[in-house]
A protein has these predicted regions:
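Conserved structural position within tetratricopeptide repeats
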Residues: 40-47, 77-81, 112-115, 148-149
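Terminal, low-structured helical/coil segments at or just beyond the last alpha-helical repeat
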Residues: 24, 141-167
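N-terminal leader/linker segments that initiate helical-solenoid repeat arrays
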Residues: 12, 16-47, 53
Length: 167
């Protein structure tokens, strides 16, 4: 069980012409509407790079939920190119790789996320899970410990670390 972060980012500074698609892209109640809004916002190509990155990230998450990994990977790559300092893009791409059992690729993406945000407890936790699936319990325990150091209330990290320490 890995932990997922869903982005509902705010696209700031959108012009009035883009307000409709931006609003649709940011709402999360109707995924079809969100997908159409993000696509329209991206197709206009007029937003600030970090806003376009958020639109790609939101759309990628929808594609991932719908099982369209190919499209999700493309949007995660676009988000990372547009806003290379946003840790959510590699984190969510890592989740996609994890779900596809591509644990080495997941670890690389989670590692990038923690390079960008050293306080990203969920990235440490999920990287620990990927290490554990690959049989590297030492690295997994280290990541679970780091996740707990950042978020002492993380029951998932605590449970995993206790289980590893009892073996």
């Amino acid at each position: 069980m890995r932990i997922v972060v869903i982005v509902g980012g705010i696209l700031c500074g959108a012009s009035l012409a883009l307000a409709g698609p931006a609003d649709d892209c940011n709402q999360v109640r109707d995924l079809g509407r969100q997908l159409r809004g993000c696509t329209a916002y991206i197709d206009k190509g007029m937003g600030a790079p970090e806003n376009l990155a958020t639109a790609h990230l939101n759309r990628a998450n929808i594609y991932a939920q719908r099982g369209r990994q190919d499209l999700a990977l493309g949007d995660y790559a676009a988000a990372m190119a547009l806003d290379p300092r946003n840790p959510l893009a590699p984190y969510n791409r890592g989740n996609l790789h994890f779900d596809a059992k591509r644990y080495d690729l997941a670890i690389a993406d989670y590692s990038r996320a923690v390079e960008l945000d050293g306080e990203f407890a969920l990235a440490f936790l999920n990287r620990g899970l990927a290490h554990e699936w690959l049989g590297d319990t030492v690295a997994a325990a280290k990541d679970y410990g780091q996740a707990l150091a950042i978020d002492p209330t993380s029951k998932a990290a605590q449970k995993r670390l206790e289980r590893l320490n009892s073996q």
